[in-house]
């Protein structure tokens, strides 16, 4: 087993019990795939037939707005899964609800929809795993909406590093601004205000 699959298998067994034979069978039905920086590998409206597990790199999930910019809903980093949010109904020809773009060169494990169906049908705890993965995404999106609607910009900025460690050193500041729902200028002023506040303590 490669170290890449060890990372994925560790993710799985943190949440459900699986035998070595089940993990081996699952790994054999997946593939390691690489994407270039800037590559959009999931596109809104296109059929989604796989989910991805990040081994290395950062991804943003976003939509284009009607005013010519984009709105970032979340980031995905090492050890996280990526999906266009349509996949977990386990139906064929589901269309992605967001775009997924690599901010860095990325290496991922591709998990085809047929593999997910196989796991849920034939593995002892496969259905539980599928349910956990679906619920995790729903909970994450609910937390995003709640934070957006109830927390101040400064509070959301302060939790950014907790949600995505070291991400500010790895991605353009305009993307952080998009995630927070503010302009890059506003973000720059916010960071300066934060530094000034810390210096006064």
Language-model-detected regions and their locations in the chain:
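Glycine- and acidic-residue-biased ligand/ion/polar-headgroup-sensing regions
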Residues: 38, 49-62, 77-80
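Cyclic nucleotide-binding regulatory module and flanking cytosolic helices
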Residues: 1-31, 87-89
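Short, Lys/Arg-enriched N-terminal segment that forms or immediately precedes the first helix
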Residues: 8, 136-146
């Amino acid at each position: 087993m490669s170290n890449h699959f060890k990372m994925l298998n560790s993710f799985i067994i943190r949440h459900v019990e699986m035998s070595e034979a089940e993990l081996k069978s699952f790994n054999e039905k997946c593939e390691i795939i690489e994407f270039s920086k800037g590559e959009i590998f999931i596109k809104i409206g296109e059929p989604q037939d796989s989910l991805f597990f990040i081994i290395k790199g950062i991804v943003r999930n976003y939509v284009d707005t009607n005013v010519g910019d984009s709105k970032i809903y979340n980031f995905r980093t090492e050890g996280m899964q990526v999906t266009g949010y349509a996949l977990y109904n386990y139906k064929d020809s589901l269309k992605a609800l967001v775009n997924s773009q690599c901010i860095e060169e990325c290496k991922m494990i591709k998990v085809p929809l047929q593999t997910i169906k196989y796991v849920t049908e034939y593995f002892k705890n496969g259905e539980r795993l599928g349910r956990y993965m679906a619920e995790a995404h729903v909970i994450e999106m609910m937390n995003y909406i709640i934070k957006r609607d109830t927390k101040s910009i400064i509070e959301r900025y302060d939790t950014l590093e907790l949600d995505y460690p070291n991400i500010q050193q790895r991605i353009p500041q305009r993307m952080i601004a998009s995630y927070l729902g503010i302009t890059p200028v506003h973000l720059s002023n916010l960071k300066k205000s934060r530094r000034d506040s810390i210096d006064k303590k």
